[in-house]
Amino acid sequence: AQKWAEEAVRDGVVESIEEQSGLYPMVSGFAHPMVTIIDSWGDSRISASFESLLMSLDHPYTKYLIKKNSNEITNKKTGAVLPANKKIVGIRSGTLVGDGQSYGQNQRQAYSGIDPEYLNDAPLYLVKFAEVDFLRAEGALRGWNMGGSAQFFYERGIRNAYLDEPQYVYEYNDLVDAYMQREQPIAYVQQDPMGDGADWPSVTKIGVKWNEADSKETKLEKIITQKYIALFPLSTEAWTELRRTGYPKCFPVLNTNDGDGSIPQGELIRRVPWQSTDPIALQNINNTGIPALGGPDLQATRLWWDVDAPNF
């Protein structure tokens, strides 16, 4: 990994916002898919772990990108009512959300989504400048020649991690300086306004500000946590980082028994099992895929880079 990373830096990597790569949905004549999924389909909401992470660090996205609850939410146990537009409300991963995709059928439709004003014109990133900087920050932390220090790439990555189309960059820039000075997290408690689960104190115990006195593990947690946020809403890459490093820290997943039965309670899915009804594809899976996987074709089986071992 070190050899390839250093070769990549020598040959040239993304060094500016202008060099990052992405697809612009509106230019191609269609809406940003996350806007369609959240607003049109009513099929997705912010996770409670992401809510807690952003709120614990007082991230700029909590001020403008993530919407507050869109309607009243009534606690099924106490009858208490959370008024509309009161707070950011996420859903615990693994929650049985129930049927219905309208607010009249399902109160979870009122949980927090993303403000389409800031997302609709944003690109679907393929390679993001900030992601490259966080990769270089981790490499430098490991002692690799990345062309600069871990602190330099970490801080530049945060400054260029915004999701927005250029006309909205000022929203992020107005807040990022104070954000980068945060040394300790806010003592945040995540609460489900419907009363379906217990209150969960934040598992985020790091700040944002770089500190050379931190251990390598804490520095890595800071780098990957900021990288995870910067990747939003590219969930595939963020999921990869979470599995590879264990960061950012997230709430335990609920109802893991609803998977294929291989995931221990509270753990996350390590991979998506192969699915095929084609005889030739099934033959290839059995003959080459399973041996290469090194384990059963289950959700809990780790891929070769997802090692259950210390990061250092």
Report the location of each language-model feature.
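C-terminal functional modules
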Residues: Y162, P166-F312
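Structured, solvent-exposed acidic/aromatic patches
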Residues: A1-V169, A213-T218
